[in-house]
Amino acid sequence: MTPACFFLRCTIVLLAVLAVPCAHAQDTKSLARDIKNPFAKLPNLQVFYDANLNTGPQHQTQHVVNVRPVIPFDVGTDWSLITRSIFPVIAQPGTAPGSSWTTGPGDSMVAAFLSPAQAEHFVWGLGPVLQIPTASNDALGQGKWAGGPAAGAVWVGEQWTIGALVNNVWSFAGDHSRPAVNQLQFEPQITYNFVSNPDRYLTFAPTITANWKASGGERWTVPVTLGIGQLVKFGKQAANLQASAYYNVIKPSDASNWTLELTIQFLFPR
């Protein structure tokens, strides 16, 4: 089955779920707002599957599963520390005809944001981000320890959530034979929760990156994106389901042009 067919079938299942309102919607209204607030005091576990179409010189599909735990901690009564981590597993196509695939973990990322605990509609966070060279193969990571500042802000309304996260990392240790790292990641977000069903939403949330070490034409990746999601319950377990598509308007020559993404996010409200 091709990634596009797999994505289509999963999207049909998701749309069937979207047709059924979440039970006890009045109990989940705050959860529906919190799932798109990166600084909400909401422990959760996100699992993303990305099919990056037409990747590399052979124009094959790269498969990526990202596991992203989000764990908040109280720092006294006035502050929260929100930790956001990314642990990827990558299936990377070969670069030459007939060459084998490379599969394994990629480089991990860990960020920690200090954020006001009592903020309601406007929330911000500041902290460090660290890239850890956990990739099992050179093709799956950069081989460098890298770190830098991270920041974000978000406005949370009844129907709209608008905000952004940004970080830049510089390499400071690692494999000396690998190129130095200096890269930007910018994640704007606009999410609209439907009035008729606040547990259902549309979202625009591209991940824009810049590799400052690359030449001008290879530096930027700028996608446009649209996603649809629904807050659901499996028994007592609340979860968020989302399907998204990304098109890279600007990209390096070997990067994918389309990304199809499926997400399940398990929520553990305190």
Regions found by a protein language model. Give the residues of each.
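Bacterial N-terminal signal peptides
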Residues: 9-19
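Bacterial N-terminal signal peptides that target proteins for export
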Residues: 1-11
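Transmembrane beta-barrel domains of Gram-negative outer membranes and organellar outer membranes
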Residues: 25-270
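Intrinsically disordered, low-complexity repeat segments enriched in small/polar residues
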Residues: 5, 14-15, 98
